[in-house]
Each structure stands twice: as C-alpha cells, then as structure tokens.
Amino acid sequence: MSQFINNKENIVTEAVDGLISTSGGALARLDGYPHIKVVVRNDWDKSKVALISGGGSGHEPAHAGLVGEGMLTAAVCGEVFASPSVDAVLSAILAVTGSEGCLLIIKNYTGDRLNFGLAAARAIEMGFKVNMVIVDDDIALPDLAKPRGIAGTVLVHKIAGALANDGGSLDEVTKVAENIIAGTKTIGMSLDTCTVPGSPKDQRIEDGKVELGLGIHGEPGFEKLDYIDAKQSIAAMVNKLEPLMSNESHVVLLNNLGGVSILEMSILANELVNSSIGKKLKLIIGPASLMTAIDMRGFSISVCPLTAQQEALLKSPCALSVWPDCKEITPIAIVDLPDGLTPVRHNPSKHDETATLITQCCEIMIAAEADLNALDAKSGDGDTGSTVAGAGRSIIAALEGLPLADHPKLFSAIGQELSQVMGGSSGVLLAIFFTAVGDASSNGASVIDAFKSGLNRMQAIGGANLGDRTMVDALSPALDALDNGLEAAAIAAREGANHTSTILVAKAGRSTYVNEEQLKGNIDPGAEAVARLFEGLSENR
C-alpha cells in the first residue's frame, strides 16, 4: 500500500520538522540530526521538574506531540518502532533539567528500559537529579512477567505533567506517576495490523476476525475472535477489564490506534459508556488518537481509579491542541422537536393485501442492499443500498400505524415517513414523489396516473430528465408501460436502467461529479433500484 512519505530513511526527521514548523513557535529541537531527534518546549526555563518521555516513533502524537506546558518537557524520538540511543536520551536530560530535576517516563520495552536507564545513570553521575518510572499497563497477557506499556502512558504524562507544572517536587511528581501506573489497566483490539512505512503489511488478521490484546507495534495478541459488531467488541474488552476494577470512580481513555474513523470511535464510545462498567466511569478522555500504532484499525481502552488529587490534575488545562480534555460522562440531553416536526401520527387502518404488497416492495429493496451499495461505490459514495434498505425497514416497522385502507392518505403518509427516515437526496425525492401521488390520488386520479403525477413533481423539483442518468431513466419508461402489466413495466425499467451504463455524462445526482471512465459500463444505482423493484414485483405476481 502506498504511503505519503518521501523515503524510509528520513521519515522521522521530516515528521519532527513538520510538527515543529506547525507548532506556532511552541516547540524546538536539539541540533543533533539525524541520530539525535529530541523535541523540547521552546519556552522552557528549567525552573520546575522536567518530564521526559519517548521511544520508537510511529505512535504519534505520542510522544513528541505531547510536549507542551502541562505535559512533557521533552520527547526523545527513535526511528519507527525502535528505541532512541543512550546519547539521544542523555542529550534531552542535559538540555532540559535544572535544579529541580527530571522524571523519565518510559514504556516497558527492553530497549527503552536499557537506553533510558543507562542515560539516567550517566546523568546522575554528572550531578543531575533524575528519577525514572516504567509504565506497564497492558493486561492482554496476564502471565507475562513484564507487561507492555501502551496507551496508559498518556495518563501518566498528563497527571505528572500537571503536578510538575504546579510546582511539585521531583519526589512528589514521581510518586503520583507511580500511583497512576499501579492503577492503570489497558487492553487493545484491532481488525488489522499496522503498516510500517517502507515495509510490506502483515496480513495476520483475516477478514471477519478481530484480534484482542495486540501491541502497539503490531505484536500478536492473545486471542482472535469472530468479528460481530461494535457492541460485542466492547464487551470482549470489558470482560477483561472489569475483574481488575475496584468500585471507585474511574477515568477511561478511549484511544484510537490510528486507523479507525471518527464515526466508528463515537459508536464505540457509546457502547463503552453503556457497558457493564459504565457506572464506574466518571471521566472520559477521548475518543482520540493519543498513542497510535501508525494506521492500525483498532482502539484501546485504559481505565484507572481516581483520587480527588488525580482528578483535579487530569482536569487541569494544558497547552496542547491534540489533548481532548478530560470530561464528565453525562446522560444524553434531549431537546423537544420544534412544533410541526414531531414524528408523524396517522390514523391507522388495516388492509391485508396492501400490507402484503408494501412489505414485498420493502423486502425487495432490503435484499438488494449489498448489490446497490457495490454499484454506487463505482460512481458515488456507496450508500444507495443502505439508504433504500433502511427506508424499507422503517416502512415495515411503521406498517401497523399506516392508513392501509385509504390509499390516497397512505401515499401521503409514506411520503411523510420517508421525509423523516430516509436520508440523502433520494429520500427527499421519494418523499416528494409519494406526497404528489397522494395529492393526485385524492383528486380522483387512477393509481398509474397518480404515479405519473408523482414523477412529474419529482422531476420539476429535482431537475432530472430522461437521459440524465438517474432513477428517472428507469421509472419513467416503467410507468409508461404499466398499463400493459407489471411484466411490461419490469422490462421497460430494466432497459432504462441498463441504458444508463452507456450515458457517460451525468446531468443530475452525485454522478455529475464523476468522470466518464468511472461511469462507463456501470448502471446508475437509483435506476437499478427501480428496475429491481419492478422485476421483483413481476416475478411474484
């Protein structure tokens, strides 16, 4: 897979320079390229305890992106997933440590322990006050003698950084860091491994599987599970965390490992706060990307019980744009809809034949969901199938509340339902269509003529005509042929839909933004949906 890099050798130095040049002057680096890559606060005066962290790169924004007032004083950057050298760590200590001393915060990996530990020993020999804490929050492998340090490291940065910024002594800052480390538990999950720049991707995790407990360098976890959904993913992680949690109030960090969309992270957040540990969670950090694994399609959950002091330190401000702040978890606030926009309530009536026909139409659309999405992905945003299938499910769910025995009112009611439940332009257009069908039907028009009135209204407002590569290209000929029966309408709809694959310039709809190459040979998904509907009805008659 291609990546936005120049060459593998300069990845870290170029990334560090990009970070510094866009920091507004808040950051600087030591003059030691390429072997020494140390990011420091540009305003640091050595009057307080310094906090230094670091390790291999690839976990951004950790650690260089967490340098700033209220968190780290300096970050020592190694190459991707490789510990920095002893000299690089020592240079950071010497550059930022004053009379108050410094605290090294490292993750529990052999290279980091050795290199930071030796640098600390050398600095102490030179007369500097240096303490070191090791984060080991990973609970994925419970029998491991030396658990890994992962996203919980960020909590240590924030709490220790806030206390240091408030003027805490080295011993006080070290103690609060140790307390947080002792209480923090983290577990991760991913649908995929990460892609190390310049290297082939490890395809260890098969499609349909999710790995629980993998590391932030792509190290294998302890278990592969069948992927079901977000709820089950959270449940699997909570099952590991819950036995280790006390009854105290906790902070939770919901961390994006780099490749999960914001939309998905919000769904995971909802599942997390509603999980079996939800009542123990008082504060949340995230969802946010804080300790990543380059582009890993995964996330981690860190929990830690809180004292009043720790809570205050977590909530204290810090001058970092990447920090999402620590917020209270609150019930969802719901505001009443304005008058006129409350959910539609109809006068329901029963008509078994009509109910069967509507259900059949909806089921045809639901069955076509995957095919329509795949077709739409070639010339649009890939959601046509989900849109029409979702509308179909909503109509089925609302069926008992519809005026099934009064067709003019039924058409209008379907239009109102679609305007509320069906998104996108297709939802609006179909709402217009059925509302107009209802109007024409109430004025005595036959069903076919009412449908044609609906099409005319939809075209007048939407602006699409025959040949513009939209659903109109299938719907218009189908309605013209409907007097001759459903089979004739289905044939006409299919011919119209197939013809859209030869139309290389779309004049309406999202396809207007797509070039000819992508349109060539591909049927418009809206027209395909219409053809599928008439074909399905014809086959079942």
Please provide the spans of the model-predicted regions.
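N-terminal loops that bind phosphate or other acidic moieties
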Residues: 1-541
